[in-house]
C-alpha cells in the first residue's frame, strides 16, 4: 500500500493505522502537541485507529515552543 506522509511517498505491507504511523515518526503512539490530517481532514486522537488506505495523503504536525 502506498501513501504520502508530509509530502513524501511511503509504502507499507498490509494495513497500518494512523497511530502506528505517528508512533513510527515520533516514538510515541499518543504524543501531546501532535495533530494529524488525512486527505485534508483532521483526525482526532480518539480516531487514530483509522486504517490508512492506498493513496491517502497524511500530514503530521508537531507543535513546538519558541520565541
Regions found by a protein language model. Name each.
Residues 1-66:
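Ubiquitin-like/PB1-type beta-grasp interaction modules and other compact soluble beta-rich domains
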Amino acid at each position: 500500500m502506498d501513501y504520502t506522509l508530509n509530502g513524501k511517498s511511503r509504502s507499507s505491507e498490509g494495513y497500518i493505522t494512523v497511530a502506528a504511523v505517528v508512533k513510527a515518526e515520533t516514538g510515541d503512539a499518543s504524543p501531546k502537541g501532535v495533530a494529524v490530517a488525512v486527505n485534508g481532514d483532521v483526525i482526532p486522537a480518539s480516531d487514530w485507529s483509522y486504517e490508512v488506505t492506498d493513496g491517502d495523503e497524511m500530514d503530521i504536525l508537531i507543535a513546538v515552543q519558541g520565541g
